[in-house]
UniProtKB/Swiss-Prot annotation:
GO terms for molecular function: heme binding; iron ion binding; monooxygenase activity; oxidoreductase activity, acting on paired donors, with incorporation or reduction of molecular oxygen. Coiled coil: none annotated. InterPro entries: Cyt_P450, Cyt_P450_E_grp-IV, Cyt_P450_sf, Cytochrome_P450_monoxygenase. The chain crosses the membrane at residues 28-48, 68-88. This is Cytochrome P450 monooxygenase lcsK. It comes from Purpureocillium lilacinum (Paecilomyces lilacinus).
Amino acid sequence: MPTSLEQAAALIGGVGTHLLYFKHGERHAYPWRYVALLLAGSLSLWAFKWSREGTTTSILAVTSSTSVLLFLYLGGLAGSVLLYRLFFNPLNRFPGPFAARLSKLYFVYLSSDLRGHRKLHELHQKYGRYVRVGPNDLSVVDPDGMKIVLGANSKCTKSAWYGQDMPYISTNTTRDRAAHDRRRRILAPAFSDKALRGYASRLQKFHDLLTSQIDASAGKPMNVTKWFGYWGMDMMCDIVFNGSFNMLASGETHWALQVVGDGLHLQGFALPPWLYRVFATMPKSSSGSRGLAAFAATQLENRMQQQGKTAHADMMQPLIEHYDRLSTDTKRAILPLLQGDSRMLIVAGSDTTSTTLVHMFYRFCKESGLVDRVREEVEPLVSDPNLISYSDIRQAQLLHACINETLRLHYPGPSGFFRKTPPEGIHIGEQHVPGDTIIQMPPYVMGLDEEVYERCSEFVPERWYSKPEMIKHKDAFLPFLAGSESCIGKNLAYIQLAVVASQIILQFDVAFAPGEDGNKLVRESKDLGMLHPEDLHVVFTRRGKTHS
């Protein structure tokens, strides 16, 4: 057995490791290094003890002694962590499940069905606006906090969540604000008004393909989740890479669409960053994210070979132009970021837009008379339903209100964005949130708050124009965030949604397919960081000619 002094040293060493190291800063990036250090330290201790005691004791005794010291060290480390979380953590004054004080794994357990956004809603209904969901994690639905946490002048920064996919990086996951802003300025020309006007005719091609497929299925059940997904992916591949997977034309799912879903799957478990890193570095569990990264890298390589030869500008053009001006060494360093941006543009642009469109048509089917009212508004503004310019429908209030109301009730990133408070903490009204707290403001929960939105569970698009009094806290709605961290594709998203929705409803009536009520879409869609919608089956019926 080890001496009393050795046992005390091991125990104190474990406590000190927590208090002097793990308690300070972020230690999530390389979890396997700690495993390696622990093994190396244990073997070194065993070798040292054998060299000192090997002549008088057995291998088994030395091994047993080393194991006891290892157990005491880990016990001291774990005990210190638990005692701090139970009695000294400044977040202890916030309500929440007791188990959440001890470990974020409790919320992982709650989210094991990949519907974490719905679990957050249940927790907020039970505990209130501020809920502790982990030892250092708060979920907040206080509308006064939106601009403080996510606004243009927020002192909060991106949390470790944005770095858990290393070495895969992108502009969106860049946590250094100055570096993010520099990269965003390079990307900005791809989203300028001039660029968006240039994309219009190319987007129209995919709107036409979608309406053609709707026409071919007219009178029969159609899975709009599938077809709107094809539309989103084909469209974004065209304006990002100057290419398409032709899923709308062929009606067949390209393997890349499955890769995108697989690449996001691990995020759905709401793992703490250190545990995410464990799984992200294991071949089987990380196959989805690695497949997505490889897919984007291949698409980028093909696109780079076409630089200067494409007939139309695309979103990668300014990024590749900037890359080509760099030195060889700088290119080598910046290539992962370029690959990451190509992945970001495809996933963020296709998934979020198509998901919103699916839920918008769910509401067109569910809300009696809604699609007729939108049609009556849009129809006088359009001369040809097969060639709609966004400038013609820009002022269509009800149409755009339907988009906003869909984003309120069915936000494509339902659990929100993870931010880290500054060292001094932040104040939301009279509530002080301690420094270095991981804070999220789930839009799904905020959208269902009666103190924020009157008749919050009802789809009332008029709240966005003719009945503004139904929005009690206007700052609570930030679907595209604000400032330099805002979604750079906001204007493109509104254009895509408004134009394609108008083109469809001007030519077709829409209703739920027999046996469909949309409940599966609403209740069973998965939260994978972004909402992964369940199938929605509707029936489109060709309308009579209404335009000369």
